[in-house]
């Protein structure tokens, strides 16, 4: 499958409101690393951000996996199970402060 940049631009334009809504949902979580808790190795807020990120992915139709609240991932199976595209991201943030 060939990826056409015009298709990507069209997808973004057609889904702009949902994209902005989901970014807003994610940045509303103050996901600063806290004290480890049971089932929350980086604290309660990073766990909330991880759960929300996976929920958003599920809302988009992707299958997700939470790996003991350390990391999670979402995937959309393609035709060729041997090939896939991956991206690395994080949902935790640093404390609020000046620049």
Language model regions located:
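Acidic/His- and Gly-rich active-site-bordering loop/insert found
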Residues: 2-99
